[in-house]
Amino acid sequence: MGMNEDPVLTLSLIASEDLSTYQYYGVVMTTTDMNCERVDGTTDHPIGILLNAPASGEMALVGVIGVFPVKTSEAVACNAQVLIDSDGLGAPFEGDTDTTAYCIGTCIRASGGTSGEKDLVAVNCCNPFKGEE
């Protein structure tokens, strides 16, 4: 059975670093207008998922709202909430313990749970939220 994976909202930004090996990783805005870089801390506020593989200075296509592949660092079950970890990879979000991380969406198709695989995640980076104690 097929699934519509068309994005609802994407942004064209500028890669402020070489992102050529980070397709399907989480990205954040930098302090420079219209620039993005890979998430490198769980407290980073992700803007979306990198959908292409640009070198530094090239156009980065970023998925903000929609259903996107997300590379994961560990198994993420279907219907689990997802965060972007300190390596820019998706991981399970536990709202009561991940109090400094942002939930970016819900896994709608699990990959099988091997690190570096792509799970399919319904992403809403316009409205990510932090966990609560």
Regions flagged by a language model, labelled:
Residues 1-133:
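Surface-exposed, low-hydrophobicity beta-strand/loop segments enriched in small/polar/acidic residues
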